[in-house]
Amino acid sequence: MQINNRGKHVKTLYSTLFLLLAWSLSTAALADSDVRPLQYDDVFLLEFASSPAPAPNSDTIVFVRNWMDRMQDRTRSTLWTVNADGSNLQALTSKDQNASQPVWSPDGSRIAYVADGQIHLYWVNSGRQAQISHLQQGPGNLTWSPDGRWIAFSMFEPKRASNPVSLPGRPEGANWAEPPIFIDDMNYRADGRGYLRAGHRHIYIMPAEGGTPIKLTSGDFDHSGQMSFSPDGKSIFFSANRYEDWKSQPINSEIFRLDIESRELTQLTDRNGPDHSPVVSPDGRMIAFAGVDDRRLAHQNHGLYVMNIDGSNIRALTADLDQHIRGFEWAPDSTGLFIYYDAKGSGTIAHQPLRGNRTVLTDEVGGLAYSRPYSGGAFSVMADGRVVFTHASTERPAELAVLSQPRGSVRVNTITDLNRDLLMKRDIGRVEEIWYASSVDEKPIHGWIMYPPGFDPEKKYPLILEIHGGPHTAYGPYFAMELQLMAAQGYVVLYTNPRGSTSYGEDFANLIHHNYPSHDFDDLMDGVDAVIARGYINEDELFITGGSGGGVLTTWAIGHTDRFRAAAAINPVINWYSFVLNADMYNYFTQYWFPALPWEDPEHYLKHSPISYVGNVTTPTLLFTGEADHRTPISETEQYYQALQLLGIDTAMVRIPGASHALHTRPSNHMAKPAYVIYWFEKYRE
């Protein structure tokens, strides 16, 4: 696509020819088979691109191709390469390796990557691959030294857990119970990881040809995240929270310079709030980083900053941009940076000069959250200033696209088509953008309507309101397999960004600060009314569902209205008092989401808890949660289930063994969730 300076889109000749070629190739294949709606097990046929990394000296791009392993019920990843014009797409690693984190050497001769917990190298000229590490723990944040001789990475270093009690009298060879586990750490469990081992993440380097890793950091602190070498290769810049009270400051961090030879640390930033993701400019003179002054708000936009290489002259580049900076990379000439942020639900790349006005280049970044239409994408800058990124669409998961700027214009060419074989045989639900006014204060609320295949506006359809989690996240114009599967069953699906959502400015996101749920409920009901007013919805067949924060609003809604025939609450929070004392991030939630600790202000916690309104519920309700969810623990689901049982309300609980808060990490769970939701809704249709 070509994008003019006002952001309007027109098809380029390249894209048109690409689509015509794809159509001509697919016509014969479709001749003997009918196009049909998506099926539940199509989940296993989805693929998507992520982690694009362009070579420093050619048009070759390496990226991660993600796919679903039906036999192992896992999402797997392999490395592929493609030229910037879309030609020469080929596999770099085999499906036997679960590969990720590709990083080019500075001269473009090698690619380092992580596969099955070890660092591997791929030699471009010979095509040879080799494992170069034998680590006890998995590495992350691979970073090449400027001379290509070293690779830095972060890795967890376990520490022997202490136990103050030793039980006497155990005979040799006796089969006693497992010993008690003694815990005295504030951070003792995490969603997706379970109960944490004692230890911390540290920074290491190792020779690029393989060898013994050298530990560079020390102390009882975590050192992880993005790293960047100084131009002479003698120092590494990184971020960490090394304050003594770091456990009670869950988001604070500073930028440090680490002298590799002496191990000396120099702190370059100093403020109350996170400073992170340092990147040295190509000319070696400056460091860019992201951060924010912490005001203890539930949502705070991180801005882009630059400083001299010695930490002096810190200045903000995006103070006038009321959005959260999600990523950034230096332009090759060091005169500015390319930045990535969400605006009105859409992933946006802009060029931010060191001095002067920024220029928006595209708003089509995203596609990584293929399950539900959350924002989220990735990009990287090529040596000649072109940008490769994950391209978003409502009709398919993330593909790769390349953005160029010939003669002052902006052109975007999609260069992969990973899901063509599946999607040319499936009828995908059409998505339409809508805006409507909130009945609370007339604020404009943004949303999207997904129509079932074969939609006829003269007919009446059941409506599903699908609510995003967070609550400080955003939906957008992205492919969403779960919602598509609902639409494939004949439902119109509405999804919106009510107050509290991100990408509409910090003030809009914080309209629910210390006040959640509240008028976000009204924004959602206004969206339902706006769709009903279009004339194609059966008002007696309204349904509601949502996950995490969307589960909160689902259970809140049925405690405040009886308009829905049935509800499905996915991993909800029911009782804020019990939540903050059971969730893994309790030291964050109590400081940023609530005005006081629960025993100091129990009325506030209960006022905003769906359990306080369960006596009003008449709606049949399905509850669906992972048994290993440490973010919104299954005890929340159990509270609501038992309350509804005591009230005699038709209810069911679906428990997913071994599943964390991220239910869709196993493809079969991704398939099960919409299947159970549709089963429940069909049960209560007219």
What are these regions (language model features)?
Residues 495-686:
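Active-site-proximal cap/loop segments of hydrolase catalytic domains
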Residues 243-244, 409, 416-540, 547, ...:
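Cap/lid segment of the alpha/beta-hydrolase catalytic domain
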Residues 72-78, 118-120, 162-163, 200-202, ...:
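Structural motif
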Residues 40-44, 89-93, 128-133, 214-217, ...:
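A short beta-strand motif characteristic of beta-propeller blades
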Residues 46-61, 96-112, 136-154, 180, ...:
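Conserved beta-propeller blade repeats
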Residues 83-87, 123-127, 207-211, 259-263, ...:
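Short loop/turn segments that connect beta-strands within beta-propeller blades
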